[in-house]
Amino acid sequence: MFKNSFQSGFLSILYSIGSKPLQIWDKQIKNGHIKRITDQDIQSSVLEIMGTNVSTNFITAPADPKETLGIKLPFLVMIIKNLKKYFTFEVQVLDDKNVRRRFRASNYQSTTRVKPFICTMPMRLDEGWNQIQFNLSDFTRRAYGTNYIETLRVQIHANCRIRRIYFSDRLYSEEELPPEFKLFLPIQKQG
């Protein structure tokens, strides 16, 4: 999808405020919902993915299973709200051995397991809104001893609220981020 586009800085694949936040995504819903709502903490539109079973409620990009994202930027950053329920996400990458590898992070797992084609790992979320930063290059090297080439697919499962998902060429400090990539909490009125 993005293979032939110039990639530097930031590349956003989901922005909850945009006119069509799920334009490149496919939805799977069973005993749950995927909808845009207003989050009270940030007073803004977010995408909520909820379901009784994390494996049957998710969004995946690209929507076409035969396509790949082709994103070469090595950092995946997600602005996600912890809903104090089971939550998992998965990223499929291509390495320099031309092997497709998957990384799955979950808040209900306690150990990291590396198998030839999938690495599952625990993820700890703070209360409220979180910025998850995932160094795909480093994970690929540490788990498989190979080099990251590109991201093929991203899948976000229940249960969470999403503000934005983007890739970047490096980690940026809060001061360096463009305003639309920051999570602004509303100023509390003193009364």
Curated annotation (Swiss-Prot):
It is found in: Cytoplasm, Cytoskeleton, Cilium basal body; Cell projection, Cilium; Cytoplasm, Cytoskeleton, Cilium axoneme. It comes from the Eukaryota. InterPro entries: CFA20/CFAP20DC, CFA20_dom. Disulfide bonds: none annotated. One of its GO terms (biological process) is regulation of cilium beat frequency involved in ciliary motility. Keywords: Cell projection, Cilium, Cytoplasm, Cytoskeleton, Microtubule. It holds the Pfam family CFA20_dom. GO terms for cellular component: ciliary basal body; cilium; cytoplasm; microtubule; motile cilium. Belongs to the CFAP20 family. Cilium- and flagellum-specific protein required for axonemal structure organization and motility. Microtubule inner protein (MIP) part of the dynein-decorated doublet microtubules (DMTs) in cilia axoneme, which is required for motile cilia beating. May also play a role in cortical organization of basal body. This is Cilia- and flagella-associated protein 20. It comes from Paramecium tetraurelia. The gene is CFAP20.
